[in-house]
Every structure is written in structure tokens, then in C-alpha cells.
Regions:
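Soluble non-cytosolic domains of exported or imported proteins
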Residues: 13-17, 21, 62-67
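Active-site recognition of the HExxH zinc-binding catalytic motif
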Residues: 16-35, 72
């Protein structure tokens, strides 16, 4: 019985990692080019949101590669905060918002089609 329980937990963790990775990579392919400087736009609105967040980054990877990884690192957390807040602790939610509030508001302003995550 314990093996089955552990296998189920392992499978849930694997599925979460896969979903998070797919969101991260999909952000690279569908969003990056429109919001970073030197791509389709000058990135001014994104840069403004980042500066209003006092240069705080959600991960060292995002901090080290801000015009390549910041959006992709944030997007799974954005989905969690906006569409599945019951799946994260209030402490985690507060940490995400305290570091990225302006970026999250920027993503909200884009009116992205997130119907996949809505009931």
C-alpha cells in the first residue's frame, strides 16, 4: 500500500514539473518576442514594470538572464497566483506578489487568453 501511495505522490510531482516546464517554454515561444527589448517591441512597458518591482527577481535564473528568462520564470507563478490560489500557501502568494506585483499587473493588462485555466 505504501508503494502505491508513494508512486502516486511521485507521479503528481512529475506532472507538476511537466506542466510548469511547458508553461515556461511556451512563454519563450509565444510571449518573449513581444515584451523584451530588441525584439518585436522596445520592451519599455516590461522594463517599467521590472523597475517598479525594485529589480526584484523571482529566481536567480531570471535575475541572471533578465531579457531571456524573467517572463518564463514568472509565468507558472502568475498562473498559480491568478488561477489556482488555493493550490499555493498564502505565504508563497505573498512572496510572489511582493517581488513581482507590477509584472503581474502588466501581465493582467495584456488580456492574454487564459481560458484554459478558467472554469
Amino acid at each position: 500500500m505504501n508503494i502505491v501511495k508513494n508512486s502516486t505522490l511521485l507521479w503528481k510531482n512529475i506532472c507538476f514539473i511537466i506542466e510548469e516546464t511547458l508553461i515556461h517554454e511556451a512563454t519563450h515561444t509565444s510571449i518573449d518576442a513581444y515584451h523584451y527589448p530588441d525584439r518585436e517591441t522596445d520592451g519599455a512597458a516590461w522594463i517599467d514594470a521590472v523597475s517598479k518591482d525594485d529589480g526584484c527577481y523571482i529566481s536567480t535564473y531570471a535575475r541572471d538572464y533578465p531579457y531571456r528568462e524573467d517572463l518564463a520564470e514568472l509565468m507558472p507563478l502568475y498562473v498559480a497566483v491568478r488561477y489556482f490560489p488555493d493550490r499555493i500557501s498564502s505565504d508563497t502568494r505573498d512572496k510572489i506578489l511582493s517581488c513581482n506585483l507590477n509584472r503581474i499587473q502588466y501581465l493582467d493588462s495584456l488580456k492574454l487568453d487564459m481560458s484554459l485555466y478558467q472554469n
